[in-house]
């Protein structure tokens, strides 16, 4: 009887330890990815400010502080406006980097699920080795995200950041799409 109770206590302690490891890994993923996307949002806010307020530092400050960084101006809205600008003013860049920039919507969806989803600490998740991933209940029905998959998401976010750096350099110029000879 005592050994059964002792076994139950040990199993419970193992589950608690497994849950701690899962939550630690989830915090690590969330922290890294949400920070990356926050930097992307900051860069887009600066690009939009520079685009719409080119010559007046006072207007730039007002636009940045009171419009583009406010909660009503969501990251999704910023992204949509940026995509329209790139398509309209930098069509050659858009053609070359359309795939990368189009992945932005996937990044936002992943970011939102990561930020707002509960961590899966079901018995199945607690029994799974941590190297097989961490599940978030609202992301693909709790399917675990492995380190490799997470790294792929980070690469996508870094590619978006690189594109934003390019777009910042393009801002003073407007591309003219070359007509193809027929």
Question: What are these model-derived regions, one by one?
Answer:
Residues 94, 98-108, 147:
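Short, well-ordered coil↔helix boundary/capping segments
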């Amino acid at each position: 009887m005592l050994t059964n109770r002792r076994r139950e206590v040990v199993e419970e302690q193992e589950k608690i330890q497994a849950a701690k490891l899962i939550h630690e890994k989830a915090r690590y993923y969330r922290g890294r990815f949400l920070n990356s996307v926050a930097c992307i949002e900051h860069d887009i806010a600066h690009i939009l400010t520079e685009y719409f307020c080119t010559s007046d530092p006072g207007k730039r400050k007002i636009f940045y502080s009171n419009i583009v960084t406010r909660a009503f101006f969501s990251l999704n809205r910023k992204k949509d406006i940026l995509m329209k600008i790139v398509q309209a003013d930098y069509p050659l860049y858009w053609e070359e980097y359309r795939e990368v920039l189009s992945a932005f919507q996937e990044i936002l969806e992943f970011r939102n699920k990561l930020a707002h989803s509960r961590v899966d600490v079901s018995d199945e998740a607690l029994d799974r080795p941590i190297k097989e991933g961490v599940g978030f209940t609202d992301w693909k029905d709790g399917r675990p995200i492995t380190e490799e998959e997470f790294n792929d998401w980070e690469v996508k976010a870094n590619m978006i950041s690189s594109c934003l750096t390019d777009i910042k350099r393009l801002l003073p110029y407007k591309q003219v799409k070359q007509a193809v000879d027929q």
